[in-house]
Amino acid sequence: MQLQLICEDAALQPYLDAIASKWQLTHDADSHFALVLTFERLELRKLDEPKLGAIYVDLAGGAVAHRRKFGGGKGQAIAKAAGLNKGATPTVLDGTAGLGRDAFVLASLGCKVQMVERNPVVAALLDDGLTRAKKDDEIGAWVSERMSLLHASSHDALAALASDAEFVRPDVVYLDPMYPHPENKKKTALVKKEMRVFQSLVGADTDADALLTPALALATKRVVVKRPDYAEWLDGVKPSMAIETKKNRFDVYVNASMS
């Protein structure tokens, strides 16, 4: 993928080169997007809209830390959808990891979570945030133990893993495909900013419907699909049950009991 690759200090250039090599990113001086390496973190900036600010992954502080401490624990909707309220601590594969927030919530509640993110820029941001989180005094130990990242297209990865005899299938496959956002629907400023940048960088997940069948083949217990409250069922398939919040819905497709 091509975008501007920028170092804030020349001493960081070898690290940026390594990131570019790992995620197959090449420099394009004409791109409106820039991946910027600072001494603190890796950031994505939209250069033609500087007021949007930088997008980066911070699992140790900010809104993510607040949700971990005060978000409702196993009583929150995502935990119920994943089956944690049944007394289980399932293994999870997050097939659309994005910036890792939902995966982090599940990991903070005890789940081992493998993350798949097919966009290399988003994966690079997530990898950087994960690396920093693993060094954090408060959360580093369990993040290292419970969270891992696999860079691949979900469609390819889910089908390939389901047919891999060596791979231990997860209890739960979690999907949160990007969905076109109507202008009349309110979002927090942060989410709105991220969605705007990501949709112009990545585009909406127009092929998201193709995720459900391989996800059902891979999950041993259930597939959880996060949808906006106004969205139709993924691939038009009615879920076994749905858990609704003010703005979202978790559609649950049950393969087997959690017990």
UniProtKB/Swiss-Prot annotation:
One of its GO terms (cellular component) is cytoplasm. It catalyses: guanosine(1516) in 16S rRNA + S-adenosyl-L-methionine = N(2)-methylguanosine(1516) in 16S rRNA + S-adenosyl-L-homocysteine + H(+). Gene3D superfamilies: Vaccinia Virus protein VP39 (3.40.50.150), YhiQ-like domain (3.40.1630.10). Keywords: Cytoplasm, Methyltransferase, rRNA processing, S-adenosyl-L-methionine, Transferase. It is an enzyme of class 2 (transferase). Specifically methylates the guanosine in position 1516 of 16S rRNA. This is Ribosomal RNA small subunit methyltransferase J. It comes from Vibrio vulnificus (strain CMCP6). The lineage of its organism: Bacteria, Pseudomonadati, Pseudomonadota, Gammaproteobacteria, Vibrionales.
